[in-house]
Amino acid sequence: MGKLAADQLTLSYDSTVIIDGVDLKIEEGKITALIGANGCGKSTILKSLARLMAPKSGTVLLEGKDIHRQPSKEVAKKLAILPQSPQAPEGLTVEELCYFGRHPHKKLLSKHTQEDHDMVEWALEATGMIELKDRTLDALSGGQRQRAWISMALAQGTDLLLLDEPTTYLDISHQIEVLELLKKLNRDHGRTVVMVLHDLNQAAQYADYLISVLDGKIYNAGTPEDVFTQPFFREVFGLECCIMRSPIDQKPMCLPTGLCPKLRAK
C-alpha cells in the first residue's frame, strides 16, 4: 500500500455519480499525472485524494488510514494541495503567501518560530523565488505567480504535493517553467507529486506514472510507455494518433492525425 491510495472510491455531486468504484495507488517518491478528456472526473479524484470532497462510498487512505477520520491539521502536515486558479488577498507579497503554508504547524495566535522562518526561506530558495519575496503577487508573471503558490505548498513541509492543472492559462514557456520546477522538487527533494494535466505529451515527458480516467473509471495506469497505446487514444480521446519516441529522451509522444472513424460518422 502506498502512502496515498483509494479503495473502491465512489464520488458524486448530489445524485450524479462522477467516479464509480475506483481503486488506485500513488507511487511514493514519483510524479503521477491524472489524464483524460474534459469532464471525465480526474479533478474530482484529486479533490477527494486531498480531502476536499467526501466520498459517496469507499475510502481514501493516507498512510494506511481513512483520511476523513484524521484531523484536518494532521492531514495538512502530510499533504499539500494547490487548486486550480488559486486566489489571494490583494497586495499580498510572495513571502507573506509562503508563510500561510506554516499554519498547520502553528497554535492559535502563536508567533512564527525559527523553524517556520527556516522552512519559508527554504521553500522560496527551492522555487527560485527568494529574490522576489517582497513582490506582490499581482506584480508577477504567470509562471512566477504559480511558483509562489508552489512555495507556499512546500512551506507546509509535506512529502505529498497535489496540484490541479498547474499549467492552465499559462503560455508554453511558463508551463515548462512550472513543470521543470516540479521535476526538480521530485528529483532533488524527494517530493511525491500528483497533478492533473491536459497536455498528454507534457504528461508523458514529466510524469513517471499516468492514470487515465474514462467515464468515471480508471481506463489504464502505468508508465507512459504502458499507457500510450492506439486503443487508449481512440477510446479515451476519440483520436487517431501516431505514437513515436522523443529524439531527446525516448519518452513516448503522440501526434494526432485525426478523429477516429466512429467520431467522424457522428
From Swiss-Prot:
| CDD domains named among the record's database cross-references | ABC_Iron-Siderophores_B12_Hemin (cd03214)
Topology of the protein relative to the lipid bilayer: Peripheral membrane protein
Domain (ABC transporter) ranges = 4-240
Q: Report the domain of life of the source organism.
A: Bacteria
Keywords from the named record: ATP-binding, Cell membrane, Ion transport, Iron, Iron transport, Membrane, Nucleotide-binding, Translocase, Transport
Q: Where in the cell is it found?
A: Cell membrane
Q: Which family does it belong to?
A: Belongs to the ABC transporter superfamily.
Taxonomic source organism:
Bacillus subtilis (strain 168)
Source lineage: Bacteria, Bacillati, Bacillota, Bacilli, Bacillales
Q: Which Gene3D superfamilies match?
A: P-loop containing nucleotide triphosphate hydrolases (3.40.50.300)
Q: List the disulfide bonds.
A: none
Subunit info here reads: The complex is composed of one ATP-binding protein (YfmF), two transmembrane proteins (YfmD and YfmE) and a solute-binding protein (YfmC).
Pfam families per UniProt: ABC_tran
Please state the protein's primary subcellular location.
membrane
One Gene Ontology CC term in the entry: plasma membrane
InterPro entries linked to this entry: AAA+_ATPase, ABC_transporter-like_ATP-bd, ABC_transporter-like_CS, P-loop_NTPase, Siderophore_ABC-ATPase
| EC numbers for this chain | 7.3.2.-
Task: Please give the name of this protein.
Answer: Fe(3+)-citrate import ATP-binding protein YfmF
Q: Which GO terms describe its biological process?
A: iron ion transport
Query: Where is the chain membrane-spanning?
Result: none
The record lists ATP as bound by G36, A37, N38, G39, C40, G41, K42, S43
Q: Which SMART domains match?
A: AAA (SM00382)
**Does the keyword Translocase belong to this entry?**
yes
User: For this protein, what is any one GO molecular function term?
Assistant: ATP binding
**Protein role:** Part of the ABC transporter complex YfmCDEF involved in citrate-dependent Fe(3+) import. Responsible for energy coupling to the transport system.
